[in-house]
Amino acid sequence: MAERTAFVERNTLETQVKVSINLDGTGKAKLDIGVPFLEHMLDQIARHGLIDLDIECKGDLHIDDHHTVEDVGITLGQAFAKAVGDKKGMTRYGHSYVPLDEALSRVVIDFSGRPGLQMHVPFTRAVVGNFDVDLFQEFFQGFVNHALVSLHIDNLRGHNTHHQIETVFKAFGRALRMAVELDPRMAGQMPSTKGCL
């Protein structure tokens, strides 16, 4: 089996981002982004998706977290698009429900080649620590646009904002794991009746 890994580097006047991923990893994460709460959430993707992540970002954090969060999402999306390759033999779809105490979230993903985000998370607070939770919309939009996936994110219940966000990221990791899994019955076959994605 060919290695499903990718390295992507993205440099702008606002951020310099490097992302390495291994879709068939063990859930290891090495994160140096400068935004601790985002790092905590990305660690959930690695751990629950069994995807190795190595992400380094130098951003204009003296302004705010916006460019860093968005550009990490963009670059991670580019890395996923590269790592899945032609998608032959891949499950393609993934979904997960994850609870954390009172919170429950559902994430559904399709590596369709068509970007689309539906995100419905009624945050109960605007900020967790120093982190503006609205930036997670920017993260996921950047990811979707560059991974070329359809992504549906729903927080079904919860009143602790940290729990709401954490269930989203854990479910996202688990949905990714399911979607990128290789099915030996589909070896060499495209997971679409169109013959391409």
From Swiss-Prot:
Keywords in alphabetical order: Amino-acid biosynthesis, Cytoplasm, Histidine biosynthesis, Lyase
EC number of the protein: 4.2.1.19
Keyword ATP-binding attributed: no
Any single GO BP term: L-histidine biosynthetic process
Domain of life according to the entry: Bacteria
HAMAP family given in the database record: HisB (MF_00076)
Protein name: Imidazoleglycerol-phosphate dehydratase
Organism field: Ectopseudomonas mendocina (strain ymp) (Pseudomonas mendocina)
